[in-house]
Amino acid sequence: MAVNKKMALELVKMRLNRLPGDTSLDPMLEARIDAAAAELEHSGIILTDSMEDVMLTVDMAVWQYQCRDQQTGMPDWLRARRRERWLRQT
């Protein structure tokens, strides 16, 4: 994973309205970031350290965290971003 994990964690915390000093969920949030990056890479996207890839990974991780107990599919906006990112690469 080429995405800056520390930056991604800080951005995930911001999106979830968590204080930067609160580290109680860091292990789970880091696991979500890793899972989101792995899912993106499994779909054929080669992640870089670009801000676009960091934000895509953050958006995936936040969506997975917020919808972990729901039976809803990926939102259209996120599916389209993932697809557009994949298309630019090929």
Which sequence ranges carry the predicted segments?
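Conserved short "hinge" loops at termini or chain/domain junctions
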Residues: M1-D53, R85-T90
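Short, hydrophobic/amphipathic alpha-helical patches that form generic packing surfaces
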Residues: M55-C67
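Short alpha-helical linear motifs
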Residues: D53-M55, A80
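Protruding loop/beta-arch "assembly-hinge" segments enriched in small, turn-prone residues
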Residues: A2, C67-T90
